[in-house]
Amino acid sequence: MKIGIPKEIKNNENRVAMTPAGVVSLTHAGHERLAIETGGGIGSSFTDAEYVAAGAAYRCIGKEAWAQEMILKVKEPVASEYDYFYEGQILFTYLHLAPRAELTQALIDKKVVGIAYETVQLANGSLPLLTPMSEVAGKMATQIGAQYLEKNHGGKGILLGGVSGVHARKVTVIGGGIAGTNAAKIAVGMGADVTVIDLSPERLRQLEDMFGRDVQTLMSNPYNIAESVKHSDLVVGAVLIPGAKAPKLVSEEMIQSMQPGSVVVDIAIDQGGIFATSDRVTTHDDPTYVKHGVVHYAVANMPGAVPRTSTIALTNNTIPYALQIANKGYKQACIDNPALKKGVNALEGHITYKAVAEAQGLPYVNVDELIQ
């Protein structure tokens, strides 16, 4: 199969879809025509020469990379890339379609095969291609929150873990999944007073077994969220409903109840965010804004700030699926691997992921009707 790897052009997105090691795996499987856009790996400290040595057939400009049968990317395409779409093209990347009507319509109009990393789902409910970036984003969220609590960044001027004679500060993590758990790990490591809120009693028990007395757990309901947010210095939003818009769990009134200089980090912003005051997506160039005295961090591609780590972690997880698609074609690969089939969000001009269709009020077609 002819495979293209374009350079990411989203603001400060320094990741690349495949490491040179991943390219070796593809070329050894017989997929020798890999079009790597010139400079695509530089942000992750991979040189063009490394890709050529790994077996990439040639380096190219973006248009040529996009002209291949399967496109491997990291982030969802931006508007300037929609013109590269064509019927039957396979796009394998993070899509996050629920809040992105224009991209969704472009995939429908061009009849692109849109396979989203974030909705590839194993039988046990886990999301293997979202997990590595959730780990990164979760760990970053607490680090970033601690930074913006510093006075010179607009925060209260406090240290999360306190020091001798000064009490630790309060961190609330809403969502106890992969991202939330990793945010809590870093907060505990910093010595903060940590609360994790989740909807699942079973998950809360798992977190208590994991953290012991280092973390307090609470059931997710409006009262518990309001009380915990009110008394928190840092709130991390880490709720995920696969493929769907994030629920608005923290109201504007809750944000107003926080002390000035408090910080919220919305990991879920790429799905619309969980804070009612998350009314914009920010960038690494301009990552925060202040509303009701609270610093809001709403960067949708957080792992792009640590691209070397993120690219390696992403490739480790995506390469088995990319190989299945390249070796068998997407239809047979999806028939053989139900987890991969759940990643198909757009196919033959239809939306085939129910949560996306519901979020945008579009007709839903079961993917099984199109892949047999």
Swiss-Prot record:
GO molecular function: alanine dehydrogenase activity; nucleotide binding
Nucleus among keywords: no
A GO BP entry: L-alanine catabolic process
Entry annotated with the keyword NAD: yes
Enzyme kind, highest EC tier: oxidoreductase
Residues holding NAD(+): 134, 178-179, 198, 220, 239-240, 267-270, 280, 299-302
Annotated catalytic residues: 96, 270
InterPro entries: Ala_DH, Ala_DH/PNT_CS2, AlaDH/PNT_CS1, AlaDH/PNT_N, AlaDH/PNT_NAD(H)-bd, NAD(P)-bd_dom_sf
Primary location group: cytoplasm
Activity's thermal dependence: Loses about 50% of its initial activity when heated at 65 degrees Celsius for 5 minutes.
Gene3D superfamilies linked: NAD(P)-binding Rossmann-like Domain (3.40.50.720)
Protein name: Alanine dehydrogenase
Gene: ald
